[in-house]
């Protein structure tokens, strides 16, 4: 229980809101172990990405050559999360 009117504290960085996430489009170059993918963005930068939880839950398969939407955080622009596979 909190004492002296102190609020609960959190560890690490505060959670990101949707406004803090950078969304970009790219193409999957190759599959890597542990559900990781190498993705090349439209601006020719290469990223290491993992699948979002909803895509994993719905068994959405991602293959090399697929167009995807990638979410990046401003803290680490070398890693991302694949949030959508375009048809």
UniProtKB/Swiss-Prot annotation:
Principal location listed in the UniProt entry: cytoplasm
Keyword Isomerase: no
Any Pfam family hit: eIF-1a
InterPro entries reported in the protein's UniProt record: NA-bd_OB-fold (IPR012340), RNA-binding_domain_S1_IF1 (IPR006196), S1_domain (IPR003029), TIF_IF1 (IPR004368)
Keywords, ordered alphabetically: Cytoplasm, Initiation factor, Protein biosynthesis, RNA-binding, rRNA-binding
One function term, GO molecular function aspect: rRNA binding
Cellular compartment(s): Cytoplasm
Chain ranges of the S1-like domain: 16-87
Gene Ontology cellular component terms for the protein in this record: cytosol
Gene3D superfamilies: Nucleic acid-binding proteins (2.40.50.140)
PROSITE patterns cross-referenced by the UniProt entry: S1_IF1_TYPE (PS50832)
HAMAP family per the UniProt record, alphabetical: IF_1
Role noted for this protein: One of the essential components for the initiation of protein synthesis. Stabilizes the binding of IF-2 and IF-3 on the 30S subunit to which N-formylmethionyl-tRNA(fMet) subsequently binds. Helps modulate mRNA selection, yielding the 30S pre-initiation complex (PIC). Upon addition of the 50S ribosomal subunit IF-1, IF-2 and IF-3 are released leaving the mature 70S translation initiation complex.
Family under the similarity heading: Belongs to the IF-1 family.
The protein's assembly and partners: Component of the 30S ribosomal translation pre-initiation complex which assembles on the 30S ribosome in the order IF-2 and IF-3, IF-1 and N-formylmethionyl-tRNA(fMet); mRNA recruitment can occur at any time during PIC assembly.
Protein name according to UniProt: Translation initiation factor IF-1
Organism (species): Magnetococcus marinus (strain ATCC BAA-1437 / JCM 17883 / MC-1)
Biological classification of the source: Bacteria, Pseudomonadati, Pseudomonadota, Alphaproteobacteria, Magnetococcales
Name of encoding gene: infA
